[in-house]
């Protein structure tokens, strides 16, 4: 509704002292009148907002209530019926009627009424503080009779419709009474001159103090109202749960009710002025609590993650890799070392990522099965046929699952470092084609079979990325990995850390390399010594050899719907004899293997990163590859340029002594990798 222009006529008011109020209203600003009009429209909803104003107005109102409480009592009783018919004529008449009816309830004695009436008449006519006194009166009436306002307004509207003739009669009476009372005011003014001198100074100070407080409260109220106008729906919903009767919650329904008045600055300021002058009945901290609560809830909403990648990134560690909760104390954090936490940094920069926790020394097959259950959740089932073939237990640990809804159409990015690159290739092969041996075994022997071994689960992997992965094996494992001394070392380590009091988990419990609760240490050592693991090909030591890698290459294939990419490093230099020698900044434990690989008979295998030859890390020999460009491709290995002076652990930041490879460089590398994965989703998302 549009705000109506307020018009005043001396002929429209009743007899008695009501004319005194009319004279006072003429001194009041248009803003207060408009505020009263909107207050009438808003009803009890808007009146409730006055309860959140400060303690200062309450004290000032109590000081002045004894002087302004019962103004115009006698005349109000005589003219209340006529004034009701004028309720909807002008906003000023509405305020007058309400003041007349409200004051009727507070009439204590006729003598007090007469005295206060005389005092107030003189003050309204001659004092410069009349507007402030009238505002205080409005404050009191608004707080005491806000519940009866609507019912009286409805009654007055009905009277206007049914008795239009009362308007003319009342107008005539008001004109006569106005003339009579103007003369009466002159005679009464002399009686109150002395009283004014005694009280005028105090009233002036009180009014000035009231004005300053009202300005401050008004500004606070306008700020709260303006804030809720911008977020009216959201703020209302938040406050409705825990703050049922506060300023923020009241402002929004009112705004919805009268949208045009929100855009009217004059009306808005008038309403704020009325609220600021209302009697405060609660602690003024309530408004501050509402604001603080809204701010906290907004911040909580802003913290909700919107990841850049649609498909989660799964980081898969390599041989002798651990997560922090199960690693030996001598080892550093796998993904980032002392430089940074790669997964956490990706998360903080908008990429959803997880660190897989699988066997440190297990075979690619066993690790792939564990990786499936790490993502999907559930108890690891290595398969009945596989367990019978290699002589270990069928079931392993139970995973909670980081992506329980993982299924065809719900894809993931697999990123593997070192042996982890082989493991993720094995997993993707099982998803698509399953394990025919397990299917046949189940047909013959019955029982359950894992969905992983049944195959037919294509369209679950978006990309496969490998970092320093020995796709074709490594001379390090050929020459050292299967030597008796190396196996003995692995046996001793497993024996030491496999006791029941150790938190270290090598992921070989299904092989028996974990002390049982009721088993003595001597019994445990004998069992570990007799384990078939040390002679089995179902282990990481075998799969890292060139023969083991070749076997994996024959069993796996490229998926035409997956983006493949490899990253390779080297940290050796050529000698005069044509060999490759480890660089000075190579990770110290790898200098032995780096120099050993650098002396290989095959010249093309000599350049290496300390553990893996460059030629083995680029792509499987039997699978198609291209040089990587800015444009991603599916179904082919995309080989990125070799990173010089990068050894095997520089991709994961484990060498804290290498000053050439900085934290910023590592962070930049991973941000670029993650961004490339997001771009690859444009190619693979069409298959969802």
From Swiss-Prot:
Organism superkingdom: Bacteria
Organism of origin: Staphylococcus epidermidis (strain ATCC 35984 / DSM 28319 / BCRC 17069 / CCUG 31568 / BM 3577 / RP62A)
Entry's EC annotation: 3.1.1.3
Signal peptide coordinates: 1-35
Gene Ontology biological-process annotations: lipid catabolic process
UniProt GO cellular component terms: extracellular region
Compartments, as annotated in UniProt: Secreted
Phylogenetic lineage: Bacteria, Bacillati, Bacillota, Bacilli, Bacillales
Catalytic activity annotation: a triacylglycerol + H2O = a diacylglycerol + a fatty acid + H(+)
Molecular functions per Gene Ontology: metal ion binding; triacylglycerol lipase activity
Composition bias type Polar residues, residue spans: 45-54, 144-175, 184-211, 274-289
Statement: the UniProt record of this protein carries the keyword Ligase: no
Gene transcribed to yield this protein: lip
PROSITE patterns (alphabetical): LIPASE_SER
Family: Belongs to the AB hydrolase superfamily. Lipase family.
Biased composition (Basic and acidic residues): 84-95, 103-143, 227-268
Protein name as annotated: Lipase
Presence of the UniProt keyword Chloroplast in the record: no
Ranges where the record places region Disordered: 31-309
Propeptide positions: 36-302
InterPro entries: AB_hydrolase_fold, Lip-like_C, YSIRK_signal_dom
Catalytic residue list: 418 (nucleophile), 609 (charge relay system), 648 (charge relay system)
Pfam families: Lip_C, YSIRK_signal
Keywords: Calcium, Hydrolase, Lipid degradation, Lipid metabolism, Metal-binding, Secreted, Signal, Zymogen
Residues at which Ca(2+) binds: 647, 650, 655, 658
